[in-house]
Amino acid sequence: MQTLEIALLSTLLLFPLVDLVLEKYKFRSKCAEYIKTSAMLWVVTGFLFFCYLIDVLKIDPPQYLPSASWKVYLAIFIFAVFIAYMKYVLSSINKDANVRLQVLNAFEDGGKSFLEILPSSRREFLLFTLLVSVSAGVCEELIFRWYLYSSIEQHTGEFVAVIGSSIIFGIWHTYLGWKHVIKTAVVGVLLCGIYLYFESIVVAIVAHIFMDVYSGSVAFIARKAQGAELTNA
C-alpha cells in the first residue's frame, strides 16, 4: 500500500473526529453549514479521484450503468414508484395534522443535531436538495460503495466488505448520535446491496440522493404546514 493510499484511508477514518470538532464551531447560518459540509465531501472525493487517476489505488473503475437492460428499466420503475410514494406522503403531511404531528415528533426523537441539519426555510430546502443531497449521494457512494467496498473486498470477501464499509459509513455520521450511526450503517448495507445487485454506481447514487431529498422534503413540508397552522390559529 502506497503512502498516498494510507493518507486517503487515514482521512476517511479520521473524518468523523474532524466532524465532531467542527460541530462545536458551527456557522450560525444553516445555509453556510450546508456549503461547508458539501465542500468537505467534495475535497475528500477529489483526493480519492486524484489517487485513482495517478494509479495509487489498485481497484477497478466503478460500473456506471447496469449491464442488463432490464435492470435499467427496473431501477427506473422503482424510482418512479418512490417518487409517487413521496408525493403521497408529502400530501398527507400537508393535509393531515395528526400525520404532521407524528412526523414532527419523530424528528424530535432524532435529537438536536439531526433537527439542525434539516431545512426550515425555502432557501434552506433548495440548498439541501440541490447541494447537500446531491453532494452526499455522489461523494459518499463513490467513497463507500466504490472505493472502500472494493478495497476491503480484495482482502476479505464480499460479506465482510459490505459490513465493513457500511460500519464506517455509519461512523461518519457520529455527530448525529449513536442511534443514527446504527441506522446509517443499516442504510449503508441497503445501498451496498443496490450497488451490487444493479452493478451500477449511478443507481446507488440516485437512490442515495432520493433518500436524502425525501428526509429534507418531509421535514420542510411538516414545518411549513405546522407554521401556517399556528399562524391561522
Name each model-derived stretch.
Residues 8-16, 41-46, 73-84, 129, ...:
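Alpha-helical transmembrane spans of integral membrane proteins, capturing the lipid-embedded, hydrophobic core
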Residues 55-135, 154, 225-232:
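Juxtamembrane helix-loop-helix connectors linking adjacent transmembrane helices
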Residues 1-74, 160, 216-233:
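N-terminal, membrane-interfacial amphipathic/helix-forming hydrophobic leader that caps
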Residues 19-23, 88-92, 146, 150:
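Short helix-terminus and kink motifs of transmembrane alpha helices
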Residues 113-233:
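Transmembrane helix-loop-helix hairpins at the membrane interface
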Residues 19, 47-55, 83-87, 169, ...:
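Structural signal for membrane-spanning alpha-helices in multi-pass inner-membrane proteins
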Residues 32-39, 98-100, 181-187:
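Cytoplasmic-side transmembrane-helix entry/capping segments in multi-pass membrane proteins
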Residues 38-48, 105-112, 187-199:
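Small-residue-rich segments of transmembrane alpha-helices in multi-pass membrane proteins
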